[in-house]
Amino acid sequence: MTPRISPERLAESLAELARIGGRPDGGVDRLAGSPADVEARQWLAARMREAGLEAGLDGVNNVFGHPPGAGPWLLLGSHTDTVPAGGRLDGAYGVLAALEVYQALAMAGHPAAARVALVSFHDEEGVSGHGFEGSEHFCASAPLASISGYLELHIEQGPRLEAEGLELGVVDAIVGIDRYDVALIGQANHAGTTPFSYRRDAGRAATRFIGGLRELVQGIEPRMVANVGALQLEPGAPNVVPGAARFVLEVRCPEPAALGAARARLEDELGRIATEEGCQLEFTPQTSWPAMAMFPGYVAALERVAQRSGLPWRRLESGAGHDAEILARHVPAAMLFVPSHEGLSHSPREHTDDRLLAQGCQALLDGTLEILGG
């Protein structure tokens, strides 16, 4: 008989962790390295030890728990740090679901309990750094040799599953992310005395590009998305034509070739608009994270679990970055998603019904057994 997780125990664990760094509005502040973050990691290590695991914090504050012995282990986990005013489920759900899976296996006396290890990675969010510091450190350190693979359960952080009436998602890829620093240099001038035809308006050049960005990237690949989250106009006065416009352009896509093709198309379009507006273009690649396919064997195993569960499900790519993409460079890795209510995440309003959280946790347990061979 397949071991069953305890929905009540999972809900209690989530509520207890949410109190560490909890906010009056229901959100959580556990920025990486903050006192609340450290307290949460110490709490988690204690919970792992109570469950019978050997657990502690490494040099960068990853929490790693494993059964006695030398492995190899299938690693389950995620992260417990948050963005400012974050939600209680992002990352934390995957960590505590992993703990619940181990507890269910151990309490049932199932032999798979000896083949499972748990982790909460440090600084996935990258609020003060580049992100994924913990998983990158883990993959460059000794414990990796004892890991046979990695599974991560997560809220979707987007609207697709809920909008389609689905309750489980099997992730087959994590998008690649490219960021570019863009500067359009025109000429500042008096906004009242300079006719439109004489202007070298960097603000107009920037907004022309941003206004057509959606159609441009979807013409490259329908699953591609792009964003300009902040636009700085200089000198920034209501009566001065902007002499410079600066912004960071972010592009995401699960298809590596399309992401590569986007760079030339975006730079060409910016160059065309800059020329028409009498501006100069500075286009500088900033950071790049490659798209990462999940391990086909693990994806197939999770699809079998989803099919047997009777839950409505689909295969999908992740539009957000996750520690799984770092692990996938080194060991087989895959992910499961549960719906996010109204697609909200990185927000105090982040929410998923307890029933869906429990179903996802059981799917993680079933997937663990499917991969380990029962």
Predicted regions: what they are:
Residues 80-83, 117-128, 157, 188, ...:
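Acidic, glycine-rich active-site loops and adjacent beta-strand->loop/helix elements
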Residues 30-32, 227-236, 248-255, 280-299, ...:
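A short beta-alpha structural unit
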Residues 4-87:
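Acidic/His- and Gly-rich active-site-bordering loop/insert found
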Residues 82-144:
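A generic, well-ordered mixed alpha/beta core segment in the N-terminal half of proteins
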Residues 194-219, 266-268, 338-374:
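His/Asp/Glu-rich mid-to-C-terminal helical/loop segments that flank catalytic regions of hydrolases
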Residues 10-13, 18-23, 74-78, 313-362:
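Zn-dependent metallopeptidase/amidohydrolase metal-coordination segment
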Residues 111, 124-127, 133-257:
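Midchain, well-structured core segments that form catalytic/ion-binding scaffolds
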Residues 58, 111-112, 215-228, 273-284, ...:
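Flexible, glycine/charged-enriched surface loops at secondary-structure junctions
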